Amino acid sequence: MIIRKGPAEIDRIGRAGGLVAETIAHVGGRIEPGVTTLELDTVADEFIRSRGGVPTSQGYKGYPRAICISVDDVVVHGIPDEAVVEGGSLVTIDVGVTLDGAIADSAYTFAVGTIDAESQRLLDVCQDALAAGIAEARLGNRIGDISHAVQVVVEGAGFSVVKSLMGHGVGRHYHEDPHVPNFGEAGRGPRLSEGMTIAIEPMITMGRPEVWLAEDGWTIATSDGSLAAHFEHTVAILPGGPRILTPRVGVPDLSRTGTP
């Protein structure tokens, strides 16, 4: 069942989203060669709690850490540990925050130091795809319009969409209806209506789209070892257009659409 929210609830989700954005920027500022992903997770946990929030991922279906940190060929759900971040890596910070009963979710892939041109293009295309998806998140459109817009940008650039992973409703719960795939036909799927809040999140690879699940039951990586990127915003569907509830702070963003 799709849960539609009123203005006050959307504002609460937006406040949670503001803390999500601040957390991503705060953790991003600590990413450097030599730091461990567990150290970054601790930074995130302490930052969120110091501002009255709770890391939504921690304990969710047994997940053991505060946030997800996915490096290089890991697409999503990387569990922070003692692994050391290296220069030239791609590091995705995926943060969910619960604040005053509202939940927001966002992700951002950082480059660690200097990366090659093709890796940078992967990041740029993923952000472009997110922007294209958000632009279609308007009253009267359908989920398929978002999905198709993302797919066109990604595949048009020669990259692959991970079809087994997708966005979702969010707000009262971490994962709500509807599913928001990153591929599909325009004009198909549930119609977008006022008060829907959804996480739009292209997850793309430089190589093939297939992925595999690690023995830890969480980490999902590319089957061919190719690099992956993941950008995500929580978005509200409103009469004036899509409202990004997790607007970026302190990091470059190509996906500003609608009301910040």
Tell me the role of every PLM-derived stretch.
Residues M1-P260:
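Active-site neighborhoods and metal-handling regions in enzymes and metal-associated proteins
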